[in-house]
Amino acid sequence: KRARPVIAWANALGHDTSRIMQVRLVKGAYWDSEIKHAQERGLTDFPLFTRKPATDVSYLACAKDMFEAAKIRPAFATHNALTVATILQWAGDNRDFEFQRLHGMGEGLFERLVREEGYQCRTYAPVGGHRDLLAYLVRRLLENGANSSFVHQLADQSISEDELLADPVEKIMAVGGTRHPAIAAPADLFQPERTNSLGVDLDDALILKETATEIAL
């Protein structure tokens, strides 16, 4: 949810320092842990969307912001064919950006774009022993094993092409909102027995400042 303000901040920083920075746009990798973190800490709300189509729309909105940011060189990390097609449509003749994919995934999607069309694609490959890679592999299993994952749906023969490539905006409108009713908000985690205790998100600079001010009083 905070991605668009971060993009605006990064672009402003580039203007202030007369530098162009590459910004990587990614989604989904830490979704489960972010949900659990917010519930355990009793935060006022989730820092991300609880419906997959809402995340897809947010990603595209951020992609558009990055194309319009003069001091940002976009790097789009995705295996979603609809997202890739949308980005290519918006880019037009602009080639000053790159795609990114995980090692072992997305070869078929990006092979033609790289070899025949000349687009850039960076491959993210894990390095290290099995102990170092275990957390990475678990995140990939959670991400790609989810029913809402594009990679998972692509392998599901029961899902039609039209359904796979449906407009995420239309999906949100069809379900009536961006919040998933089956995912309890942090305050409602223990309902109906009781309300969850309210935590303080010290990662939020504004909340940290307010907390420090109250302590000083």
What is each residue range found by the language model?
Residues 192-217:
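Non-catalytic terminal/interface segments that mediate subunit docking, oligomerization
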